[in-house]
Amino acid sequence: MTGEGYFEVAHVERNGNRVPFFVSVIKNQEQVEKVEVLGTHFNINAYTNESRIETTLINGSIKLASKYNHNVLLKPGEMSKLGNGKIEVKQADTEMAIAWKNGAFVFREDLPSVMRKIARWYDVEIVYQQTAPENLMLGGWISRSSNISEVLNHIQLTGKVHFKLEGRRVIVSR
């Protein structure tokens, strides 16, 4: 898979043996992570324009295997981040990980990360002017049913960034 997906997988047995369910994560036309599902609810964020693949376990258990020979067993409430050939496991904000599925944008990240999410959701191109803030961190919640102007206006309330919408392009400046 490429992109983002939420999975609810039931434990299945056939002839007394557990039947595995696998999700393969593809990046640059190459399998970089394989998730073996052991009866669970989990989310995978694996967009090609993101530097990391994030897998968040809501409940149950999953086993991750990367092309870099890393194997990890996640426990409920944990997330793995695969990037630069390493898997990092940490406690997850599960609400934030599946907010998209529940119709919300939840941000606790830098401006470029937020803008990549907006670009995907609204199918727009993001253009940064030289005056765009470089290290602006954003936090907040807004409904995904909001139109793009509402979302951009909420972010502009920080007073540290300005947006201009020109057709399918969002111009970002200070």
Predicted feature locations:
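A residue-level detector for the "anchor" residue at the start of short, highly conserved motifs
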Residues: 1-174
